[in-house]
C-alpha cells in the first residue's frame, strides 16, 4: 500500500534531494567550508565595471574604438601609473598600442632600431598596467580571461610579488626568454587585449545597432566575441529581426532605409541579398522618372555612391510604394493595432495629384504611380508579388543575417533589470497625462512590464515558430508593429509620417508627435512609478535608455528627473551629431558610482593608429558613493549569498549525519 506524503514531507523530500545533488559537488565539510570562504571573499571585492552604450546606428569605427579604449578609462589608468615617469607623447603611444596592438606593432617594427630594448620596456609597462586593471578581480576570474597560449606565464607575472633578488631575476628571465624565442609580439597583443577586457566587466547595448550606418555587421561580430554583453532591442534592430523572420513589410522597410542612405553594400555584399530583381523592376517602371523625393542621402566623399544615385533613387521609390501596399495586409488583419490612419494610398486624388489629411488638402510633389491602380490602390501587381517573394527569400536564406539575428535573440530582450537599473531602448507607453497605456493583444489587455514581456515573447514566436502557424504569423505582425505602432515601447510616437515626408513638401505634415513618456520624463514621480512597476526601489534605482538624441549643444541634459533617468543617445550616428553637438555617450557604473562620458567626433581608425589620435572624452560624475560598492551589492552578489546560505545548510546536514561525508 502506497503511503502518501503530506505537503511538508514532500517539500522536505525535495529539499533533501537538492542537498544530495549539492553534496556531489561538495562531498565533505572541508570542501563546502572552503567554498563558503571563497564566496564570502568575493562578496567583499569591488563590483565590476559596467559600460552602457546606445544608438550605435551601424557606426562601427567609433564603437570599436570606444570598446578598445574603455571610453577613455585605459588612458586614465596609464596616466595614474606613469604620469610622473612618462611624457605625454609616450603615454599616447602606449595607449594606442593597447587599443590597436597588431597595427601599432607593425609600425614600431619598421621604425624601432633596437627592438629588443623596446620590447623589454614595453612588456614591463604592459604587465604593470595589466596588474593594476585586474587587481579588483579574483585570480579565478582573471585566469578565465587569460589567453590559452600565455595563461601560465601571465598569471605568474601578474600575481607574484617580486621583492627579493631571486624573484627579480626570475621575472626578468621570463621577459628575456619571451623576447629571445620571438614571441614578444604575440605576448604584447595578448596583454593588450587582456587590459581591454579587464576594463569592462559587463557591456550593455541599449538598442539600435542597426540603422543608416555602414557596418552594423561588424558591430555584431564584435559583440559575438565579447566576454559579457546584453542587448535591449531598438526599433531598427527589430526591423531587421522582422526582415530575417520573413515579415514582408519589414523587408520593404529595411530596403527603403538602405536605399535612402545608399547603404546597399551591407545588404548585397555582406548579407548576400540579391537586389537585381528590385533594380530590374525599378528600371522598368521608373526609367524616365527623376524620383527627386527619393534621391539617396550619399556622402560627399563617396564618388562610387554618387554614380549610382539615379538607379538607387528608382529602387528607393519602387520599394517605398511596395511598402505602403504591403502594410495594408497587416493593418486589415489586425484591427487591434489601430493603424487604419496610416492607409493613405486610397486617400489620394490621382487626377488632381492631391491628398486630404486631417481636413487639409495637400499637393503631392510626385504624382507618378505606374504600379498603382487608383480603383484598387493596395493591390499588388503580379510583378510586385514575385518581387517581394524573391526579396523575402533572400533575407530568410541569408546565413550571415540569420546568424546575427539569432545572436540578437540570444543576448537581447525588450528590457533588463540589472544591478538596480532598468534598461530599455525607447519608452514605457504612457498617455499625455502620464497614465500607463494598455494594448489589447489576443483578447487580453497588457500594459507596462507585462506589455514589454508579451512583446518579447511574441517577437520570439514570430522568428522561431513553425512557418505557417498562427503563432508565427501573429508574432511576425507584432514585429512590424514594434517598428511603427503607437503603443510600441520601441517607437514612442503616435504615428510614423513616412508617406508625408516623401510626398508632401509642407513640413507641418511631417510632424510625428511623441507619446506622453517623452513629455513627462523630467518628472521624478513618473520615473518612480515606472521603477515600481518593474519591481525596483525608486530610492536606489534609475532608468537608463536611449532612442531620442540628447541635444547637448542646446543645453539639454542627459540626466533627467533628478537623476532617476539617464538618456545616453548622444549621437554615435554622424547624422545626429549636428543636433547633439557631441558624438555619443558612455555611461560607466563602477564601484565608486556613475560617470557619464561624452565623446567628441572620431575621425577614423587609421588616424588613431598613424597619428595616435584618441577620441576626446569628457567625464561627468553623476553619482559618487561614499562607500565603494562591492559584489555583495550586485545581482551576482545576491546569487552568491543564496549559494552561501545553501552551503551553510549543507554543513549542518553533514554535522547531523543526515548525509554522509565522502573524504
From Swiss-Prot:
Cofactor(s) for this UniProt protein: Mn(2+)
Key word Hydrolase present: yes
InterPro entries according to UniProt: FBPtase_class3 (IPR009164), Metallo-depent_PP-like (IPR029052)
Highest taxon, organism lineage: Bacteria
Gene Ontology biological process terms in this record: gluconeogenesis
Alphabetically ordered keywords of this record: Carbohydrate metabolism, Hydrolase, Manganese
GO molecular function, one term: fructose 1,6-bisphosphate 1-phosphatase activity
Keyword Manganese: yes
Pfam entry (one): FBPase_2
Enzyme type, top EC level: hydrolase
Pathway(s) served: Carbohydrate biosynthesis; gluconeogenesis
Reaction catalysis annotation: beta-D-fructose 1,6-bisphosphate + H2O = beta-D-fructose 6-phosphate + phosphate
Entry EC number(s): 3.1.3.11
Family: Belongs to the FBPase class 3 family.
Protein name: Fructose-1,6-bisphosphatase class 3
Organism whose genome encodes this protein: Clostridium botulinum (strain Eklund 17B / Type B)
Primary gene name: fbp
Amino acid at each position: 500500500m502506497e503511503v502518501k506524503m503530506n505537503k511538508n514531507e514532500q517539500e522536505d523530500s525535495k529539499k533533501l534531494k537538492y542537498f544530495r545533488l549539492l553534496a556531489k559537488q561538495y562531498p565533505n565539510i572541508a570542501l563546502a567550508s572552503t567554498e563558503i570562504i571563497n564566496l564570502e571573499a568575493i562578496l567583499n571585492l569591488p563590483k565590476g565595471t559596467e559600460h552602457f552604450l546606445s544608438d550605435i546606428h551601424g557606426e562601427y569605427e567609433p564603437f570599436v574604438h570606444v570598446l578598445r579604449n574603455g571610453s577613455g578609462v585605459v588612458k586614465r589608468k596609464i596616466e595614474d601609473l606613469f604620469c610622473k615617469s612618462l611624457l605625454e607623447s609616450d603615454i599616447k603611444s602606449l595607449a594606442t598600442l593597447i587599443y590597436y596592438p597588431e597595427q601599432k606593432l607593425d609600425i614600431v617594427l619598421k621604425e624601432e632600431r633596437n627592438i629588443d630594448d623596446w620590447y623589454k620596456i614595453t612588456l614591463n609597462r604592459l604587465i604593470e598596467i595589466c596588474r593594476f586593471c585586474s587587481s579588483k578581480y579574483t585570480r579565478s576570474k582573471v585566469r578565465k580571461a587569460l589567453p590559452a597560449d600565455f595563461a601560465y606565464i601571465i598569471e605568474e607575472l601578474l600575481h607574484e610579488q617580486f621583492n627579493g633578488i631571486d624573484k627579480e631575476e626570475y621575472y626578468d628571465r621570463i621577459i628575456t626568454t619571451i623576447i629571445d624565442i620571438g614571441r614578444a609580439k604575440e605576448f604584447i597583443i595578448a596583454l593588450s587585449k587582456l587590459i581591454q577586457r579587464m576594463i569592462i566587466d559587463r557591456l550593455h547595448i541599449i538598442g539600435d545597432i542597426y540603422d543608416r550606418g555602414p557596418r552594423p555587421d561588424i558591430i555584431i561580430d564584435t559583440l559575438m566575441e565579447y566576454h559579457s554583453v546584453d542587448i535591449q532591442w531598438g526599433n531598427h534592430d527589430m526591423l531587421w529581426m522582422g526582415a530575417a523572420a520573413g515579415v514582408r513589410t519589414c523587408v520593404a522597410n529595411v530596403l527603403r532605409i538602405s536605399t535612402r542612405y545608399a547603404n546597399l553594400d551591407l545588404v548585397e555584399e555582406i548579407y548576400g541579398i540579391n537586389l537585381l530583381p528590385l533594380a530590374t523592376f525599378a528600371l522598368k517602371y521608373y526609367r524616365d522618372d527623376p524620383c527627386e523625393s527619393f534621391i539617396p542621402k550619399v556622402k560627399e566623399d563617396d564618388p562610387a555612391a554618387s554614380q549610382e544615385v539615379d538607379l538607387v533613387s528608382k529602387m528607393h521609390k519602387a520599394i517605398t510604394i511596395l511598402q505602403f501596399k504591403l502594410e495594408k495586409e497587416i493593418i486589415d488583419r489586425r484591427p487591434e493595432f489601430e493603424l487604419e490612419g496610416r492607409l493613405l494610398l486610397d486617400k489620394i486624388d490621382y487626377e488632381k495629384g492631391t491628398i486630404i489629411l486631417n481636413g487639409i488638402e495637400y499637393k503631392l510633389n510626385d504624382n507618378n504611380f505606374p504600379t498603382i491602380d487608383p480603383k484598387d490602390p493596395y493591390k499588388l501587381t503580379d510583378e510586385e508579388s514575385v518581387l517581394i517573394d524573391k526579396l523575402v527569400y533572400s533575407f530568410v536564406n541569408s546565413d550571415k543575417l540569420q546568424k546575427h539575428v539569432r545572436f540578437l535573440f540570444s543576448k537581447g530582450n525588450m528590457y533588463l533589470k540589472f544591478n538596480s537599473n532598468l534598461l530599455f531602448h525607447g519608452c514605457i507607453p504612457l498617455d499625455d497625462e502620464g497614465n500607463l497605456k494598455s494594448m489589447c493583444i489576443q483578447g487580453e489587455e497588457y500594459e507596462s512590464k507585462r506589455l514589454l514581456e508579451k512583446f518579447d515573447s511574441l517577437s520570439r514566436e514570430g522568428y522561431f515558430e513553425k512557418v505557417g502557424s498562427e503563432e508565427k504569423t501573429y508574432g511576425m505582425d507584432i514585429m512590424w508593429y514594434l517598428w511603427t505602432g503607437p503603443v510600441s515601447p520601441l517607437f514612442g510616437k503616435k504615428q510614423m509620417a513616412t508617406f508625408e515626408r516623401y510626398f508632401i513638401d509642407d513640413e507641418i505634415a511631417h510632424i510625428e508627435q511623441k507619446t506622453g513618456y517623452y513629455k513627462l520624463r523630467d518628472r521624478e514621480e513618473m520615473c518612480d512609478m515606472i521603477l515600481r512597476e518593474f519591481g525596483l526601489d525608486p530610492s536606489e534605482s534609475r532608468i537608463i535608455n536611449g532612442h531620442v538624441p540628447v541635444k547637448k549643444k542646446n543645453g539639454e541634459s542627459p540626466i533627467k528627473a533628478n537623476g532617476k533617468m539617464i538618456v545616453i543617445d548622444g549621437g554615435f550616428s554622424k547624422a545626429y551629431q549636428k543636433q547633439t553637438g557631441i558624438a555619443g555617450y558612455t555611461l560607466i557604473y563602477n564601484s565608486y558610482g556613475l560617470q557619464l562620458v561624452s565623446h567628441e567626433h572620431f575621425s577614423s581608425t587609421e588616424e588613431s593608429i598613424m597619428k595616435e589620435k584618441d577620441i576626446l572624452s569628457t567625464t561627468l560624475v553623476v553619482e559618487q558613493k561614499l562607500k565603494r560598492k562591492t559584489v555583495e551589492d550586485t545581482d551576482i552578489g545576491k546569487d552568491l549569498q543564496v549559494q552561501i546560505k545553501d552551503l551553510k545548510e549543507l554543513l549542518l546536514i553533514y554535522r547531523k549525519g543526515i548525509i554522509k561525508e565522502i573524504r
